[in-house]
């Protein structure tokens, strides 16, 4: 039997050394040996863990490959099925990307969608969206400047990145948006097919009218920011009225006036008219369409006037329409701007898009419309590319400047109104026709999807 000697304690050594001769059996000494059963169990466990890890890695790889293939093919149904069948994979990806809870995931998904849609509307819209999402970008260690530069360097990669972030952060919201877009595409396709079958005999006539209307718009560089905002506002009114009102407030849309935004042709041959005050009116296609600031005119009559008008009248109407939209938005937004920041707003005119990041969203919207207004005034006078010095000089003539009195500011707005009146007078009835026709262009021609002007108005030009 083993014995131990601990310091300070009596020895446990057997003192009677003759005890062995007493015929007592010797206690056997056992050496510690490996437990084969335990070792085998541990080995099998390790192998099982490795197999399970390999299986998990393979499952993750298969999922990512399948999802990537479905995404590349724009197969929304396949992506939905994968997400529904493998929620654990979505959760794993979310945790890996720092998406830690449902509320945060929804915020990230919404921000990604906002940035993606804003980028499609142009630099100014993207800048406004980046400014709005500064706190969320900061949580990822990003600045608006960095994100904006990444977009400018590779717009397609930016579009893909924001789309995938939305997909992984909030799959439900992502697929809801995709379904709504698909629904709109289906509706547009049905409308297009109905028009093709019912109006095949009028194809050549309508084609000539489309081209004539498109030329009038492009020749005058029809409204950009304002037209995009009106179109988006009209769509939001149908899907989310509360959000539409918030958007109108931010974009400088006067929801009290009854300004015509959109004319939509229905399957039964009637038309629905949408106005900025949120009202809708349905009538026959030959029924005159009214709106604030225009004399009532039917859609066919409007197209006929544009088709017969000379280029000078078309251009004057286009510039007048652009100037009017910009002035309306400037008037609405100007009430919200701190006059102490007017100097900064005016300087931003020549400092490029990055400088605008220092402006508030309302000031950015104001500047977008101010630029459009100056272009509408300058373009008819110069007939050529507009230089920065020209823009700066005209800004002093028509926009508020540091030190301007209230009377001086009012005088400048009257001068801008005078420019609009002159253009309106040159255009004659073509202006009314263009207001109605341009409101109908976007809806009717989107189904063909041939071309998008700088204003966001889509049409076919051959």
From Swiss-Prot:
Record lineage: Viruses, Duplodnaviria, Heunggongvirae, Uroviricota, Caudoviricetes
Keyword rRNA processing tagged: no
Organism superkingdom: Viruses
Stated name of the protein: Putative DNA transfer protein p33
Protein family: To phage P22 gp20.
Keyword set, alphabetical order: Viral genome ejection through host cell envelope, Viral penetration into host cytoplasm, Virus entry into host cell
One of the GO biological process terms: symbiont entry into host cell
Family matches, as InterPro entries: Inj_translocase
Role according to the record: Component of the phage injection machinery. Required for injection of the phage DNA into the host.
